[in-house]
Amino acid sequence: MMVLGRIVAPFGVQGWLKIHPFGDDPAAWRKMTHWWLAEDPDGPESAWVQYKLASCRPHGKGLVALLEGVPDRNAAEAIEGRYVGAPRDAMPAPEKDEYYWGDLVGLDVVNETDETLGRVSGLISTGAHDVLQVEDGETERLIPFVAAYVLDVDLAARRIRVAWQKDW
Protein backbone atom coordinates (compact mmCIF):
# COMPACT_ATOMS: atom_id res chain seq x y z
CA MET A 1 0.00 0.00 0.00
CA MET A 2 1.31 3.44 -0.91
CA VAL A 3 0.56 6.05 1.75
CA LEU A 4 -0.64 9.24 0.08
CA GLY A 5 -1.63 11.51 2.94
CA ARG A 6 -3.59 11.83 6.14
CA ILE A 7 -7.05 13.02 7.17
CA VAL A 8 -6.43 16.04 9.37
CA ALA A 9 -9.95 17.23 10.18
CA PRO A 10 -13.60 17.15 9.22
CA PHE A 11 -14.57 19.89 6.78
CA GLY A 12 -18.08 21.23 7.25
CA VAL A 13 -21.08 19.24 8.44
CA GLN A 14 -21.81 17.02 5.43
CA GLY A 15 -19.02 14.46 5.87
CA TRP A 16 -16.28 16.23 3.93
CA LEU A 17 -12.69 15.58 5.04
CA LYS A 18 -9.65 17.85 4.99
CA ILE A 19 -6.64 15.90 3.67
CA HIS A 20 -2.94 16.67 4.10
CA PRO A 21 -1.22 15.14 1.04
CA PHE A 22 2.32 13.78 1.31
CA GLY A 23 3.11 14.20 -2.41
CA ASP A 24 3.25 17.19 -4.70
CA ASP A 25 0.35 16.32 -7.04
CA PRO A 26 -2.71 15.55 -4.93
CA ALA A 27 -5.00 16.63 -7.77
CA ALA A 28 -4.08 13.33 -9.46
CA TRP A 29 -5.89 11.52 -6.66
CA ARG A 30 -9.19 12.51 -8.29
CA LYS A 31 -8.44 9.97 -11.01
CA MET A 32 -8.73 7.14 -8.48
CA THR A 33 -12.23 5.81 -7.90
CA HIS A 34 -11.39 4.41 -4.45
CA TRP A 35 -9.21 5.38 -1.50
CA TRP A 36 -8.10 3.14 1.34
CA LEU A 37 -7.90 4.29 4.98
CA ALA A 38 -5.97 2.87 7.92
CA GLU A 39 -4.94 3.95 11.41
CA ASP A 40 -1.40 2.60 11.01
CA PRO A 41 0.43 3.38 7.76
CA ASP A 42 2.72 0.39 8.29
CA GLY A 43 -0.08 -2.01 9.13
CA PRO A 44 -0.96 -5.10 7.11
CA GLU A 45 -2.94 -4.82 3.87
CA SER A 46 -5.95 -6.28 5.68
CA ALA A 47 -6.08 -3.23 8.00
CA TRP A 48 -6.80 -0.87 5.09
CA VAL A 49 -10.52 -0.19 4.50
CA GLN A 50 -11.67 0.73 1.00
CA TYR A 51 -13.95 3.74 0.41
CA LYS A 52 -15.46 4.93 -2.86
CA LEU A 53 -14.48 8.51 -3.67
CA ALA A 54 -17.61 10.62 -4.18
CA SER A 55 -15.88 13.97 -4.71
CA CYS A 56 -12.50 15.63 -4.30
CA ARG A 57 -11.20 19.14 -4.88
CA PRO A 58 -8.15 21.25 -4.07
CA HIS A 59 -8.34 23.37 -0.94
CA GLY A 60 -5.39 25.57 -0.01
CA LYS A 61 -2.28 23.39 0.07
CA GLY A 62 -4.32 20.24 0.47
CA LEU A 63 -7.58 18.63 -0.55
CA VAL A 64 -11.09 18.22 0.69
CA ALA A 65 -12.84 14.99 -0.15
CA LEU A 66 -16.15 13.26 0.30
CA LEU A 67 -16.18 9.48 0.66
CA GLU A 68 -19.24 7.27 0.32
CA GLY A 69 -20.16 5.90 3.73
CA VAL A 70 -19.10 9.10 5.52
CA PRO A 71 -22.44 10.97 5.53
CA ASP A 72 -21.90 13.64 8.20
CA ARG A 73 -19.48 15.42 10.50
CA ASN A 74 -19.75 12.73 13.21
CA ALA A 75 -18.67 10.04 10.74
CA ALA A 76 -15.86 12.31 9.51
CA GLU A 77 -14.65 12.87 13.08
CA ALA A 78 -14.59 9.09 13.61
CA ILE A 79 -11.97 8.65 10.87
CA GLU A 80 -9.95 11.80 11.59
CA GLY A 81 -6.22 11.02 11.75
CA ARG A 82 -6.43 8.00 9.45
CA TYR A 83 -3.92 7.60 6.66
CA VAL A 84 -5.02 7.64 3.03
CA GLY A 85 -3.43 5.09 0.74
CA ALA A 86 -3.86 3.08 -2.42
CA PRO A 87 -2.35 -0.05 -3.91
CA ARG A 88 0.42 0.80 -6.37
CA ASP A 89 -1.58 -0.56 -9.32
CA ALA A 90 -4.49 1.79 -8.50
CA MET A 91 -2.28 4.87 -8.81
CA PRO A 92 -2.13 6.93 -12.00
CA ALA A 93 1.08 6.39 -13.95
CA PRO A 94 3.65 9.09 -13.15
CA GLU A 95 4.85 11.40 -15.91
CA LYS A 96 8.32 11.02 -17.42
CA ASP A 97 11.03 11.79 -14.84
CA GLU A 98 8.45 11.80 -12.03
CA TYR A 99 8.36 9.14 -9.33
CA TYR A 100 6.23 8.08 -6.44
CA TRP A 101 8.16 8.25 -3.20
CA GLY A 102 7.19 4.67 -2.45
CA ASP A 103 8.93 3.57 -5.65
CA LEU A 104 12.19 5.24 -4.55
CA VAL A 105 12.34 3.87 -1.01
CA GLY A 106 14.63 0.84 -0.92
CA LEU A 107 16.64 1.76 -4.03
CA ASP A 108 20.42 1.60 -3.84
CA VAL A 109 22.26 4.90 -4.26
CA VAL A 110 25.64 5.05 -6.01
CA ASN A 111 27.81 7.96 -7.06
CA GLU A 112 29.53 8.67 -10.37
CA THR A 113 32.46 6.39 -9.47
CA ASP A 114 30.08 3.53 -8.53
CA GLU A 115 30.73 3.87 -4.80
CA THR A 116 27.70 2.68 -2.86
CA LEU A 117 26.34 5.47 -0.66
CA GLY A 118 23.53 3.46 0.88
CA ARG A 119 19.85 2.80 0.37
CA VAL A 120 16.93 5.25 0.24
CA SER A 121 15.11 4.99 3.58
CA GLY A 122 12.69 7.86 2.99
CA LEU A 123 12.18 11.30 1.54
CA ILE A 124 11.66 14.70 3.10
CA SER A 125 9.63 17.49 1.54
CA THR A 126 11.33 20.80 2.33
CA GLY A 127 9.05 23.05 0.32
CA ALA A 128 11.78 24.04 -2.12
CA HIS A 129 12.51 20.46 -3.21
CA ASP A 130 12.44 16.90 -1.95
CA VAL A 131 15.44 15.34 -0.21
CA LEU A 132 16.50 11.68 -0.32
CA GLN A 133 17.29 10.11 3.04
CA VAL A 134 20.07 7.64 2.27
CA GLU A 135 21.21 5.26 5.01
CA ASP A 136 24.37 3.18 5.07
CA GLY A 137 24.70 1.49 8.43
CA GLU A 138 25.01 4.28 10.98
CA THR A 139 25.56 6.97 8.34
CA GLU A 140 22.66 9.00 6.98
CA ARG A 141 23.08 11.26 3.97
CA LEU A 142 20.54 13.87 2.90
CA ILE A 143 20.77 14.34 -0.86
CA PRO A 144 18.60 16.94 -2.62
CA PHE A 145 16.36 15.25 -5.19
CA VAL A 146 17.17 17.75 -7.95
CA ALA A 147 18.76 17.33 -11.39
CA ALA A 148 22.05 18.87 -10.23
CA TYR A 149 22.63 15.88 -7.92
CA VAL A 150 20.35 13.09 -9.17
CA LEU A 151 21.79 11.94 -12.47
CA ASP A 152 19.68 8.85 -13.13
CA VAL A 153 16.87 6.86 -11.56
CA ASP A 154 16.69 3.28 -12.83
CA LEU A 155 13.66 1.62 -11.24
CA ALA A 156 14.26 -1.65 -13.10
CA ALA A 157 17.82 -1.91 -11.74
CA ARG A 158 16.65 -0.50 -8.37
CA ARG A 159 19.42 2.13 -8.43
CA ILE A 160 19.80 5.90 -8.25
CA ARG A 161 23.03 7.46 -9.55
CA VAL A 162 24.00 10.77 -7.92
CA ALA A 163 26.71 13.42 -8.13
CA TRP A 164 27.68 13.08 -4.47
CA GLN A 165 30.86 12.05 -2.72
CA LYS A 166 30.99 9.41 -0.03
CA ASP A 167 32.73 11.76 2.43
CA TRP A 168 30.22 14.62 2.09
UniProtKB/Swiss-Prot annotation:
SUPFAM superfamilies (alphabetical): PRC-barrel domain, Translation proteins
Biological-process GO terms, alphabetical: ribosomal small subunit biogenesis; rRNA processing
Q: Which domain of life is it from?
A: Bacteria
As for family, the record states:
Belongs to the RimM family.
Function, as annotated, reads: An accessory protein needed during the final step in the assembly of 30S ribosomal subunit, possibly for assembly of the head region. Essential for efficient processing of 16S rRNA. May be needed both before and after RbfA during the maturation of 16S rRNA. It has affinity for free ribosomal 30S subunits but not for 70S ribosomes.
Primary place of residence?
cytoplasm
Its Gene Ontology cellular component terms are:
cytoplasm; ribosome
List UniProt keywords, sorted A-Z. Answer: Chaperone, Cytoplasm, Ribosome biogenesis, rRNA processing
The record's Gene3D superfamilies line, in alphabetical order, gives: PRC-barrel domain (2.30.30.240), RimM (2.40.30.60)
Protein's organism = Azoarcus sp. (strain BH72)
What protein am I looking at? Ribosome maturation factor RimM
From the UniProt record, report the name of the gene that encodes this protein.
rimM
Q: How does it assemble?
A: Binds ribosomal protein uS19.
Q: Which GO terms describe its molecular function?
A: ribosome binding
PRC barrel domain segment(s): 96-168
Per the record, what about its domains? The PRC barrel domain binds ribosomal protein uS19.
Q: Where in the cell is it found?
A: Cytoplasm
